[in-house]
UniProtKB/Swiss-Prot annotation:
The lineage of its organism: Eukaryota, Fungi, Dikarya, Ascomycota, Pezizomycotina. Keywords: 2Fe-2S, 4Fe-4S, Cytoplasm, Iron, Iron-sulfur, Metal-binding, Mitochondrion. Belongs to the anamorsin family. Residues 1-130 are annotated as: N-terminal SAM-like domain. Residues 212-228 are annotated as: Fe-S binding site A. Signal peptide: none annotated. This is Fe-S cluster assembly protein dre2. Pfam families: CIAPIN1, DRE2_N. It comes from Aspergillus clavatus (strain ATCC 1007 / CBS 513.65 / DSM 816 / NCTC 3887 / NRRL 1 / QM 1276 / 107).
Amino acid sequence: MSGRTLLLSPPSLSSQPERLNGILQSYDRKTTDLQMLDRLILGVVNLPDAAYSRIIILAGEEDSISESSKLTTRETFSHIARSLQKGGYICSQHEQQGQAFDHNEAVLVGLIPTDNGKFVKPDIEDMRAVPLRLGRKKHDKTISSNLAEPVRNHQASPTVAQDQAEDGFRYSSGRNIVTASAHETSDNEIIDEEDLLDGSELAAPIIQPPECRPKAGRRRRACKDCTCGLAQKLEEEDAMRRHAADKQLGAMKLSHGDLAEVDFTVQGKVGSCGNCSLGDAFRCEGCPFIGLPAFQPGEEIRLLNDDIQL
């Protein structure tokens, strides 16, 4: 079969360029691609669908395929199988069946094993459904007809048929076969949920269950599916507390007199990187001098009328 070839190499083989080049020389470089298994697992590389006629998993150190077998997980192997063309196959470098990947994983993704250790992707379009005609014995047909005889001869009484017809069931004439329509509904069966409770019931106070009542020394907690109103009440209390805390911890406003002089170069106040004086490009994320221009170490910085003066 003519087509492109994909070589999947374990990461240990990348440290042996001479051996890797020797393997590549045995394949046509114009129609051969090389990918690393670890990059495929991490999602750095995405293989195109139905692009290769054969995929070969290379051996690692000392011609061992155990490393490749550990890296080919179910998700990775499924992605590799999707990149095969119909009729293409996947195998190990030495065509040793069962060493480069698991048999079960190959079968689960739809590949068919062969005698030479290759797993072939079948051409589903060539497969057709074949009807199976199962013959029945004449004796069984006779028994079935005899069993159905009393049922056909049995007639439903008119009273029963009339009563059950009023319940929404229909009977075929002359037989006791019930055919009920699941889609037939009456308008009377639809109940408006707004009519279930009247005004007096809605105005009645909610009785709190004993398990929802607060215990001494503990904060009340609502049930997971609370219906007594405790969960809504606790949410309102928490919202009020957060609003009060945000109001107290509002943004601090400085007057014009408070901005007379601020020295940012206090001795001992430096960032963890030690590059605070070089500018924001060299400062770490938590540096106290972020936003200030570059300055000389020990230089005094003043803020007058919101303007930085060195």
